[in-house]
Amino acid sequence: MSTSICPCGSGNLLDACCGHYHAGHPAPCATALMRSRYSAYVLGLVDYLVATTLPAQQAGLDRHAIGAWSAQSTWLGLEVESSEVFGGQPEHAFVTFTARWHDSTGEHSHREQSSFVQNDGRWYFIDPTVEVKVGRNDACLCGSGQKFKKCCSSYL
């Protein structure tokens, strides 16, 4: 059992916090998933970052670039500003946060409102940088069975 503090900023032990999700347990909400993804960047867990991205987008991720950015950065902290959950099936959410890090070019901060979708009991990050080929009347990328225009289109 790890005695290290979780990098997400909760103050809890890693194993009792994000490490639980890194080990395969589903995050109970979008905020927990977002925090666990930040921790995964800190810890270099590229497989986890890919696995928690919307499955239809996973092939478009640059695993090498993710790993390099993770390894070349000193992570300075995470601040979750807000979380907004929208009902419906599937459930969607926005999480607004600021992440800070230092790399060879200096100190940086990034503020973002990320989109998430829950499907089959798991939350997924919807990556706005990964282009997807889907028509408005096609089945949604998240696997809900709904048309894309009625489901995730407004979150991309």
Swiss-Prot record:
Q: Which Gene3D superfamilies match?
A: 3.10.450.50
Record SUPFAM superfamilies: NTF2-like (SSF54427), Sec-C motif (SSF103642)
User: What is an example of a Pfam family matching this protein?
Assistant: SEC-C
**Recorded family membership:** Belongs to the UPF0225 family.
Protein name per Swiss-Prot or TrEMBL: UPF0225 protein PFLU_1319
